[in-house]
């Protein structure tokens, strides 16, 4: 996690509720990750909604360190078409940190969509070109993981609702001829 995702929702950056909500959001993230079987993660708590005020090199270094330590072959990042500026910055910094040099293991980079963020960029839409078929157990696991984010969970027709998640999975499934799917945009694929 690059940004803390909480402070930008407050008018006063010194509001004492920020710390309380930040702790709750971090706990939500941990519970969500654990429900998916993820046990290795980092929280960097850079200021939410203000990544444009952080030197890009600092964010690049965070990501380069993670890539060096983890040595992934596949990296997933936010979409460059996202309405959220922090997400677009993370996308750019990911591409910088994942440059194809001899000490990097990355073969593929994908961007993903985030409900209530990616689909609202009407002038520059997310264009998926890679689809991953899901079954009902995958969808249930995804919804369960999201259920821990009580600060993000909304009622339908908001996209960040349980029905919103299911609707997107069914729509992406229709696009590729299956019941359920997730959609990604392949940014880079090295077969070397």
Predicted regions located by residue number:
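Active-site loop/turn elements of alpha/beta-hydrolase fold enzymes
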Residues: 2-4, 45-48, 114
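Conserved nucleotide-sugar phosphate-binding/catalytic loop shared by glycosyltransferases and other
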Residues: 17-48
């Amino acid at each position: 996690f690059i940004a803390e995702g909480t402070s930008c929702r407050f008018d006063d950056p010194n509001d004492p509720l920020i710390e309380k909500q930040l702790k709750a959001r971090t706990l939500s993230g941990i519970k969500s990750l654990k429900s998916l079987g993820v046990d290795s993660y980092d929280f960097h708590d850079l200021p939410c909604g203000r990544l444009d005020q952080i030197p890009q090199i600092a964010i690049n270094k965070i990501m380069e360190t993670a890539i060096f330590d983890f040595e992934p072959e596949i990296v997933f990042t936010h979409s460059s078409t996202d309405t959220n500026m922090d997400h677009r910055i993370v996308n750019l910094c990911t591409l910088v940190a994942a440059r194809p040099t001899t000490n990097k293991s990355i073969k593929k980079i994908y961007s993903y969509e985030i409900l209530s963020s990616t689909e609202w960029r009407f002038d520059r839409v997310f264009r998926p070109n890679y689809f991953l078929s899901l079954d009902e157990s995958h969808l249930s696991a995804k919804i369960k993981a999201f259920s821990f984010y009580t600060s993000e969970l909304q009622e339908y027709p908001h996209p960040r609702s349980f029905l919103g998640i299911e609707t997107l999975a069914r729509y992406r499934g229709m696009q590729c001829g299956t019941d359920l799917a997730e959609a990604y945009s392949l940014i880079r694929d090295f077969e070397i």
